[in-house]
Amino acid sequence: MTAYWISVYREIVDEAKVAAYGALARPALEAAGGRFLARELPEQTYEAGESTRVVIIEFESVDAARRAYESEAYAAALAALDGGLIRDLRIVPGVG
């Protein structure tokens, strides 16, 4: 069953660190089978929605998404991020 990596950026602390992270994270996650579906600010928010960057990545399974997060390549991206960002990251199984 497909799974979705959903990341909501709460606060960008250091733009340079976020850029360094992005340069490493995208290729690491794509190499692990991730397919980027969205990466941007919302066009519209409702209810308690905040206008902060959202990233949605599709994986073939929850296990594939977990393996991507735990990979050496993604660990290097996290090391580059080094506190430059406060975010909410979830891995959610797809429906059906």
Q: Positions of the model-derived regions?
A:
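Short S/T/G/P-rich N-terminal loop/turn motif that feeds into the first structured element of a domain
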Residues: 1-53, 60-70, 93-96
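C-terminal structural segments of small proteins and small subunits
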Residues: 65-90
